[in-house]
Amino acid sequence: LYDQILEGMLDFIDGDDDADYTSSDVEICGSLLSKFISSVPEGISHDKAMVEVKTLVLALNELNEQCDFSLIETDQREGICELVFQTLAAAGVEFDEDVTEDWREW
């Protein structure tokens, strides 16, 4: 899933489309996602996990804004949300709603 998200972003750059972001922006996005995954270990408290979600989402908001709101499109948004949900589930954090929605601007 992680690779699919980033490959989708890179494919847009490589295509005929005129992207408002660079491969460096995609690398930054990948770093943010990797940092999130590693910051949510198994057994993390729900409250601490939500702090990590908020940190990720706000950082992605800022990055996407710097890219003229074109880095995170529908496919990437869905993939990022799914990656967040899978990471939380693997850590044993229960949730019953979209935990990114309160902060997400993409």
Each predicted region: which residue ranges?
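Non-transmembrane, amphipathic alpha-helical segments
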Residues: 17-25, 41-48, 69-72, 76
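Short, well-structured alpha-helical segments
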Residues: 30, 50-53, 97-101
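Surface-exposed polar/charged interaction patches
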Residues: 8, 12-16, 39, 43, ...
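Amphipathic alpha-helical binding modules
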Residues: 67-106
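Generic structural signal for well-ordered, non-transmembrane alpha-helical segments
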Residues: 27, 34, 54-61, 78, ...
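Short terminal alpha-helical segments
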Residues: 1-41
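Mature extracytoplasmic domains of secretory-pathway proteins
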Residues: 33-63
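Short intrinsically disordered, low-complexity coil segments enriched in acidic
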Residues: 1-4, 49-53, 104
